[in-house]
């Protein structure tokens, strides 16, 4: 069962849709992100898993309340909820784009119908239903990707070796520059970003924590974290290889790709126009599986947070089992509906991925720093955490928004020069260091 629970951690609609497009357009620099995941999963298994299982709470943020007060728990869980809503919206939107290309359905209708289906089965079975459904969908997803890659490779006139020849000649397997620049996506920038965002995912993301807590033992929970981390490398490599193979395929047969079909749209176009009907259906199922499993997990875990951190603490402090179930159902529906509206809002952005990164940087950039401040520094106080969070939020907002609003005039001098992926890195470090320095410099007078 733990292996099945890890399937969702290794595949998602973002990896399925974005990775092939990224490899097609550029190279394997983004694959460095995958290489960082085993590092984060190691720390999760060694430190975070036993820690959370010892707390005995379904919320990942009860520790923050114990260390710094109720505000810290509310802050962290609010950041989590905002991040999940943004994540759901971006995935629903990304999911609708290829389905629109594949079947010609209206994007808004795809978003609405998919969301209703996800809300329904999330409500019917709770977390266990999501875990088992994700396992089935995950196998379909991986199987569909492998089949698609094989078809691509063997469609080449000179066989699979031709894909590698073209890719090597055009440097499509490059992992990026090994220079020290912090303004572009070098190997090191991608690796550092991956370590921090995955430490946050494995360390305090409620999606992962729920899986630690549903394991029968510490050993199983640790295995789940490690297995999922290491599984992601070969799985993501398949998706990057699909993008590289697409590049080689359409370079060999340029007449098969219409003008205007670029980036993320190339893979869906290949599915529709180059695969047999049966395989096309399998890939359609895989794409839907990716989005539905990811969004369902976000809805279920978000509803749990609302129940434990808000409803049972501030609205109804002693809810009956029936009231708790009703609160979960209502939360599922509300979160799902909000996700629909966020997805519709993405219709107006130039790049869904850019918008998702900006939102995730703002909403999740400081949670890891706050957690580490309380986890590592036993003497850190409430005031230290508050000062740290304030400083961290300022840095995160500056790095995320200044490049957008400080484009022209003298204000351009104050725009962040750093790559956007480093936002969570600086935000986390600033919160931790500011809180730690506050603890050392602003000692309580006795």
Model segments located where?
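Membrane-embedded helix-loop-helix hairpins and adjacent transmembrane boundary segments
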Residues: 1-4, 8-446
């Amino acid at each position: 069962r733990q292996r099945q629970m890890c399937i969702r951690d290794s595949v998602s609609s973002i990896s399925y849709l974005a990775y092939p497009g990224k490899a097609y357009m550029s190279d394997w620099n983004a694959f460095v992100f995958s290489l960082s995941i085993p590092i984060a999963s190691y720390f999760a298994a060694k430190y975070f898993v036993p820690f959370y299982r010892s707390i005995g709470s379904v919320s990942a943020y009860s520790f923050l309340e114990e260390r710094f007060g109720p505000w810290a728990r509310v802050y962290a869980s609010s950041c989590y909820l905002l991040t999940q809503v943004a994540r759901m919206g971006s995935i629903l939107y990304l999911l609708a784009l290829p389905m629109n290309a594949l079947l010609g359905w209206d994007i808004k209708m795809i978003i609405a119908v998919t969301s209703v289906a996800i809300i329904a089965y999330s409500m019917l079975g709770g977390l266990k239903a999501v875990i088992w459904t994700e396992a089935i969908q995950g196998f379909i997803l991986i199987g569909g990707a492998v089949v698609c890659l094989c078809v691509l490779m063997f469609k080449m006139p000179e066989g699979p070796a031709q894909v590698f020849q073209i890719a090597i000649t055009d440097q499509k397997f490059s992992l990026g520059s090994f220079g020290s620049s912090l303004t572009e996506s070098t190997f090191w920038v991608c690796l550092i970003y991956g370590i921090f965002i995955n430490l946050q995912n494995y360390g305090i993301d409620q999606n992962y924590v729920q899986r630690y807590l549903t394991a029968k033992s510490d050993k199983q929970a640790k295995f789940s974290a490690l297995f999922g981390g290491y599984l992601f490398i070969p799985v993501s490599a398949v998706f990057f290889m699909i993008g590289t193979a697409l590049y080689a395929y359409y370079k060999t047969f340029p007449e098969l790709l219409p003008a205007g079909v670029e980036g993320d749209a190339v893979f869906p176009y290949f599915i529709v126009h180059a695969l047999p009907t049966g395989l096309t259906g399998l890939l359609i199922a895989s794409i839907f599986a990716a989005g539905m499993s990811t969004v369902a997990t976000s809805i279920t875990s978000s509803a749990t947070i609302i129940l434990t951190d808000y409803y049972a603490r501030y609205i109804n402090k002693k809810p009956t089992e029936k009231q708790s179930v009703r609160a979960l159902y209502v939360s599922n529906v509300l979160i799902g509906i909000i996700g629909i509206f966020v997805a519709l809002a993405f219709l107006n952005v130039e790049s869904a991925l850019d918008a998702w990164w900006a939102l995730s940087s703002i909403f999740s950039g400081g949670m890891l720093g706050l957690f580490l401040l309380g986890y590592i520094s036993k003497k850190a106080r409430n005031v230290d955490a508050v000062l740290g969070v304030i400083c961290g939020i300022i840095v995160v907002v500056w790095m995320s928004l200044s490049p957008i609003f400080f484009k022209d005039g003298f204000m351009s001098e104050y725009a962040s020069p750093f790559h956007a992926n480093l936002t969570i890195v600086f935000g986390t470090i600033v919160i931790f260091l500011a809180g730690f320095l506050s603890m050392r410099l602003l000692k309580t007078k006795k």
